[in-house]
Amino acid sequence: MIALIQRVSRASVVVDNQTIGAIDKGLLVLLGVEREDNREKMEKLATKVMSYRVFSDENGKMNLNLTQAGGSLLVVSQFTLAADTGRGLRPSFSGAGTPEQALGLYEDFVAFCRAQGVTTETGQFGADMKVELINDGPVTFNLQV
């Protein structure tokens, strides 16, 4: 399971010209599900995302996690993160989870974060989305479990 996280001062997702999810300070999470992923991996990754210290403390050091910084999450499903780009000029998605598996783990990821008290907005699974963000830093990390 893969989470590409970006520290943002704001981010939003638009589907059919309507904003369906938006946050101010927080993390934009692009979430990719691979075939071997399961609930245990999902919980481990969600915990890591919420606990990862990417926000600056009073000394300007990346020392605060999402909750400590008072941030929110915007979680967007992104199957292309599971692409194999090692050969040729066209990505292969054979390692990506099935749509049913990915939807279940995506929904579980969001529910798990909300259950921890984190304000969590979402995109729309499987939709053609327009994602807008102001990357703060920029600060971007590729987390995998």
Swiss-Prot record:
Catalytic activity, reaction form: glycyl-tRNA(Ala) + H2O = tRNA(Ala) + glycine + H(+); a D-aminoacyl-tRNA + H2O = a tRNA + a D-alpha-amino acid + H(+)
GO cellular component: cytoplasm
Keywords for the protein's UniProt record, in alphabetical order: Cytoplasm, Hydrolase, RNA-binding, tRNA-binding
Localization: Cytoplasm
Enzyme class: hydrolase
Coiled-coil region(s): none
Record InterPro entries: Daa-tRNA_deacyls_DTD, DTD-like_sf
E.C. no: 3.1.1.96
Name of a matching Pfam family: Tyr_Deacylase
Biological processes per GO annotation: D-amino acid catabolic process
Motif Gly-cisPro motif, important for rejection of L-amino acids: positions: 137-138
GO molecular function: D-tyrosyl-tRNA(Tyr) deacylase activity; Gly-tRNA(Ala) deacylase activity; Ser(Gly)-tRNA(Ala) hydrolase activity; tRNA binding
Superkingdom in the source lineage: Bacteria
HAMAP family per UniProt: Deacylase_Dtd (MF_00518)
Physiological role: An aminoacyl-tRNA editing enzyme that deacylates mischarged D-aminoacyl-tRNAs. Also deacylates mischarged glycyl-tRNA(Ala), protecting cells against glycine mischarging by AlaRS. Acts via tRNA-based rather than protein-based catalysis; rejects L-amino acids rather than detecting D-amino acids in the active site. By recycling D-aminoacyl-tRNA to D-amino acids and free tRNA molecules, this enzyme counteracts the toxicity associated with the formation of D-aminoacyl-tRNA entities in vivo and helps enforce protein L-homochirality.
Description of its domains: A Gly-cisPro motif from one monomer fits into the active site of the other monomer to allow specific chiral rejection of L-amino acids.
Family as reported in the entry's similarity comment: Belongs to the DTD family.
Subunit and partners: Homodimer.
Name of the protein this chain belongs to: D-aminoacyl-tRNA deacylase
Gene: dtd
